[in-house]
Design a protein with these regions (language model features):
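Short loop/turn motifs that connect adjacent beta-strands in outer-membrane beta-barrel proteins
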Residues: 180-195, 231-243, 258, 274-279, ...
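Transmembrane beta-strands of outer-membrane beta-barrel pores
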Residues: 141-145, 201-205, 229, 248-256, ...
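Residues that define the transmembrane beta-barrel architecture of outer-membrane proteins
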Residues: 167-173, 193, 217-223, 260-266, ...
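Membrane-embedded beta-strand positions of outer-membrane beta-barrel proteins
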Residues: 195-199, 225, 244-248, 280-284, ...
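Detector for outer-membrane/organellar transmembrane beta-barrel domains
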Residues: 239, 247-332
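Alpha-helical, heptad-rich or low-complexity scaffold/stalk segments
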Residues: 26-69
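Outer-membrane beta-barrel "beta-signal"
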Residues: 222, 339-341, 360, 377-389
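Transmembrane beta-barrel domains of Gram-negative outer membranes and organellar outer membranes
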Residues: 57-61, 93-252
Length: 389
């Protein structure tokens, strides 16, 4: 009966059998002596010791040969070296460590496009809370303070003065959310119109007046709804017209007589920019009619103004300077001028700039608050603002 090969012999025979098909044509034409050698050893089935010794002798007689080079291969000249291979691996996907940037914070889009989400790529979706005007806490010093507010309506005249100080705190909260988008068809599907709701609250707090229990001197509430349409067009000298829109705004201080102040307006607005360094925005409005008996502040448009023009300059990512002017557009020229400087404060834990700004502001004119609509003031403030969150 034929005995099974020992394990070492079986492994050796298997390796030899696998190696034979890989031999080059030249090797397959080699003398049959090498081939006959292992065949003779395999034929010694009756004597395992002699068979193992035969395979050992045959293996010792073999010499390793490198695989033959292809006949078509030619030595390459030094100057003919092939270029390095192109990496055909697929691009790396975002990992958990990668910083994901929302469209409305993607710096490859302009400031106005990100602010109003004018393009599909700068969109952050509906019903997300975003900043509107700067959210500010600042210390304010003024050349005067309105201790006994008056109005063109006798019902709205304060009966006695209050000993307010000229130095106080100012706090502003301002948020908005997009209610809808894509309301009107456009020839360019990459542009988006949108409907927004915004709310701004500004308070003057007499923090440095302990003798009168540090009251809030005035708080203005300003809800508004606005529609923004991306009127994208190239203008002369490199300017780009970015948007137009309209809105409805209510502003009031929520107080009872005689300190109640309020008005309602409809407005048109527009904005353009130059290379994301310069921005010009404008609004013009019309006050909605109120009866004389219900008008808390007659002639407010002749003081606060009927139009607003803003110019902003961003010389570098850390600084923004802006100038905002309002004008009454009437026979008597009134209004206000506001000069602002916002400077970035620090970086976040992921290395990006934070949304905190050192906010310095100088205001001169009418309407710094509703209670001061008919009182001219010059106000200087320094504080910290949160923008574009």
């Amino acid at each position: 009966m034929t005995r099974a090969l020992p394990l070492p012999l079986r492994c050796c025979a298997a390796l030899l059998g696998a190696a034979l098909p890989l031999a080059s044509p030249a090797q397959t034409a080699a003398p049959a002596a090498g081939d006959a050698g292992w065949r003779q050893c395999a034929a010694l089935a009756g004597d395992s010791q002699a068979r193992l010794a035969c395979f050992d002798r045959w293996a010792g007689e073999q010499a390793w040969q490198a695989p033959a080079a292809s006949a078509s291969a030619q030595p390459a000249a030094p100057g003919d070296a092939p270029p390095p291979p192109v990496d055909a691996a697929p691009p790396a996907t975002h990992t958990a460590e990668a910083v994901q940037v929302d469209g409305c914070r993607d710096a490859q889009y302009g400031t106005l496009s990100r602010f109003w989400e004018l393009e599909a790529g700068s969109d952050c979706g509906a019903f997300r809370f975003r900043g509107y005007r700067p959210m500010t806490v600042s210390v304010v010093g003024a050349n005067n303070v309105n201790r006994q507010p008056t109005s063109g309506n006798p019902e709205n005249n304060a009966t006695s003065p209050i000993d307010y100080r000229r130095t106080e705190m100012r706090m502003q909260l301002s948020v908005r959310t997009k209610l809808a988008q894509g309301l009107l068809p456009r020839s360019n599907p990459g542009l988006r119109d949108s409907l927004w709701f915004g709310y701004t609250q500004q308070s003057y707090w007499q923090l440095f007046s302990p003798d009168i229990s540090r009251p809030f001197r005035n708080t203005d509430h300003e809800p508004e709804i606005m529609y923004v349409y991306p009127t994208d067009a190239r203008l002369p000298w490199g300017w780009r017209w970015r948007y137009s829109g309209l809105g409805l705004v209510h502003q009031s201080n929520g107080q009872s007589l005689p300190l109640s102040r309020s008005w309602n307006r409809v407005y048109l607005m527009s904005g353009m920019e130059l290379a994301d360094r310069w921005r010009i925005t404008g609004r013009i409005w019309k006050r909605l009619h109120e009866s004389a008996a219900n008008d808390d502040n007659p002639g407010i448009s002749n003081y606060v103004g009927r139009a607003e023009l803003g110019v902003a300059w961003t010389p570098d990512p850390d600084n923004t300077l802006s100038l905002t002017a309002r004008h009454s557009l009437g026979a008597t020229a009134r209004g206000s001028v506001r000069l602002e400087w916002l400077q970035s404060l620090g970086t976040s834990f992921v290395g990006r700039r934070t949304n905190l700004r050192l906010h310095t502001q100088l205001f001169s004119g009418y309407g710094d608050s509703l209670i001061d609509y008919n009182r001219r003031r010059t106000v200087f403030s320094v504080g910290v603002s949160l923008v574009d969150f």
